[in-house]
Structures are given as structure tokens and as C-alpha cells.
Amino acid sequence: EFGNTALIGENRQGVILDYQLFRESAADSQLLFESLLRVWEGTGHHVEGVVTDRGFASAANSRALKEGNTFDGLCPRKPAKLSQRMQEEKFARLQRRRAQTEARIGILKHGFLGQPMRAKGFAHRELALAWGVLTHNLWMLARMRKIKKKAAPKAVLLQAAA
């Protein structure tokens, strides 16, 4: 996406909690637990569930998620296994939600980093990504506050009517 491999992790509200740009191409399945550790260290909260694309799926990752009492929403590599997992309501719902993450990468890339990204060299691309994530998250927080303000009068009216 960025001329280098980028890992983006977000919460259900769309706020990016973890990102990393890699100089060399890295296997997705090897990146998962470093990301979860950074989220835990940064927020102090245990991740309740992980939803990814096929690149992150591995028996070792699924086993470790189970041992950590974290919902395993890793998209299976085998289509038959994916069809089977899509019968599970929570898995299917979270996989549909994952499509928003793909869109989030597009928003980050085109809306906040520019197309093409003008930063040359790894250090400058890494810095541009950091600024892009910060700007994106400020935008998301402002949108969340705006939505909350719109909902507040309705809640007050409903409470007054009760």
C-alpha cells in the first residue's frame, strides 16, 4: 500500500490503535502478536477479539488467541473452512466489519497521506504515516464527538418523557 508493508490495527470505532511500517516485506502471520502487545502496552486493555484477512491465519496464531481468551476472527486460508466459519454469527459479523478496515486503509492513504505519497525514503514515509495516523484519529474523534452531541438531545428528551 505504501511502497513498504504497513500494518494497521483499529478498534471497532475506527480509531487506529496500532500501525507499523516495515522496511522489508514481512509475513503477516508473524506480525500479529507484536501488534497485540503494542496495543496492550499502549492502552492497558486486553484485546477481546482479533479479525484479520487470510494472511494472518495460522494454527499457531489461532492456538495462542484461544489460550489468551481472545476471540479468533482470523480469516481461514481454505475456502471450505471460511464457509464453515461464516456460519458463526459473531465471526460473520466481524468479518463484514473487517471490510471497513480495508476502506480505512484507503481513507488513510488517499485522504491523509496523498496519492502518491510524496515522502521519499523509508524514514520520511514512516514519519508521514505517523502524521497521517494522528490526523486520521483526530478526525475520527471529532466525528465521534459530533455524533455524540447529536444523540445527546434525543437521550435527554427520551429521559424527560419517561
Question: What is each of the regions a protein language model found here?
Answer:
Residues 68-77:
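Short hydrophobic/aromatic-enriched beta-strand-loop microsegments
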Residues 89-162:
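Basic, amphipathic alpha-helical segments enriched in Lys/Arg and hydrophobic/aromatic residues
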Residues 51-59, 79-80:
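Acidic, metal-coordinating catalytic cores used for nucleic-acid/nucleotide bond scission
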Residues 1-48, 52-54:
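Polybasic low-complexity intrinsically disordered regions
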Residues 11, 35-42, 68, 104-107, ...:
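Generic, well-ordered alpha-helical scaffold segments in large soluble proteins
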Residues 81-89:
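Short, charged, surface-exposed secondary-structure boundary motifs
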Residues 23, 76-81:
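Short, acidic/turn-prone active-site loops that include or flank metal/cofactor-
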Residues 59-67:
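Short glycine/threonine-rich loop-to-helix capping motif typified by GTGT followed
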